[in-house]
Amino acid sequence: MLRKMGEAVARVARKVNETVESGSDTLDLADCKLVSFPICIYKVLRNVSDQIHLITLANNELKSLTSKFMTTFNQLRELRLEGNYLFRLPNEVSSLQHLRAIDLSRNQFQDFPEQLTTLPALETINLEENEIVDVPVEKLAAMPALRVINLRLNPLSADVRVIAPPLIKFDMLMSPEDTRAPPP
């Protein structure tokens, strides 16, 4: 077990070093078995955090992200968090004013993360395969850049299915009503 942990730590260190040394705008920490974002990464990336435009933390074991993560990487254009255990986002997600795409699919959201509706550049939201019942349709309709929101495989209420289509100017992807039964 210790050997596997050591290998995981070494993999994270290698990926972070590659980002710093290459001057890449991408930090890919997918499939690293992370339960939280490593604090030491803030220090290592302090001189290049403004240059990072894409972070992938997909398929880890994250339950939350800190406000420090959001404010440190406030130049992000894309954030990939699919396949974790997230159920909410910190309020500081509103500092991601340049964010164009966020993937929160296959997490544990029961409530739509309404902070996303304050992001002026956000074009794509993927919340597929969560537990979301209700969606702030009016707030989404007011988002200037939004083009697609994926809500497939969520137990959406009938109200969302009926009210949303006439109000929105973007593509709202939903599963057929009988794909998943709502929770009891």
UniProtKB/Swiss-Prot annotation:
Q: Which SUPFAM superfamilies match?
A: L domain-like
What top-level branch of life does the organism fall under? Eukaryota
Q: Where are the LRR repeats?
A: 23-44, 51-72, 75-96, 98-120, 121-141, 145-167
Q: What is this protein called?
A: Leucine-rich repeat-containing protein 20
Which keywords label this protein? Leucine-rich repeat, Phosphoprotein, Repeat
Instruction: Decide whether keyword Repeat is in the record.
Output: yes
Q: Which residues carry this modification: Phosphoserine?
A: S175
Indicate yes or no for the key word Amino-acid biosynthesis: no
